[in-house]
């Protein structure tokens, strides 16, 4: 069965890593972006970019529609990850963490608590900047996954 990597691509810092690591593997890459992130950059043959409307969650809905059981999905959106855990081969964060049924609920709970703080006018610490170490961790985890398929 054919494997695709589907990337929630509007703000994903590992797009180029995925493209490089999948070259010559027979794995296809689909990058989903909203039209506000349109680019005319030419991609390799194994890469396809799908643009969707700019509406809230439009990219997420399209990913859910396209994803199938042998796919790898890369997203930082915990809500999207929770919808896909039982649908695809692997759902992973761009820092290399794998979403599982045993860790997604605590991530969703933390997201909810942070939203409550923001609604009350409070602030919370955001994620740290993406580093070279994060990229290397992602690439290592991603290589392991594509070598298993």
From Swiss-Prot:
It holds the Pfam family DUF188. It comes from the Bacteria. Belongs to the UPF0178 family. PANTHER family: UPF0178 PROTEIN YAII. This is UPF0178 protein SE_0451. It comes from Staphylococcus epidermidis (strain ATCC 12228 / FDA PCI 1200).
């Amino acid at each position: 069965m054919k494997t695709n990597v589907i990337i929630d691509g509007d703000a994903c810092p590992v797009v180029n890593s995925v493209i490089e690591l999948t070259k010559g593997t027979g794995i296809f890459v689909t990058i989903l972006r909203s039209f506000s992130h349109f680019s005319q950059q030419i991609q390799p043959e194994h890469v396809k970019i799908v643009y969707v409307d700019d509406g809230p969650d439009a990219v997420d809905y399209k990913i859910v529609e396209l994803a199938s059981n042998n796919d790898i999905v890369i997203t930082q959106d915990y809500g999207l990850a929770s919808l896909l855990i039982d649908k695809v081969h692997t759902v992973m964060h761009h820092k290399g963490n794998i979403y599982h049924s045993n860790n997604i609920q605590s991530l969703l709970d933390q997201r909810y608590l942070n939203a409550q703080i923001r609604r009350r006018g409070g602030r919370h610490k955001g994620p740290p900047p993406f580093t070279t170490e994060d990229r290397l961790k992602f690439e290592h985890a991603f290589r392991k996954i594509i070598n298993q398929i």
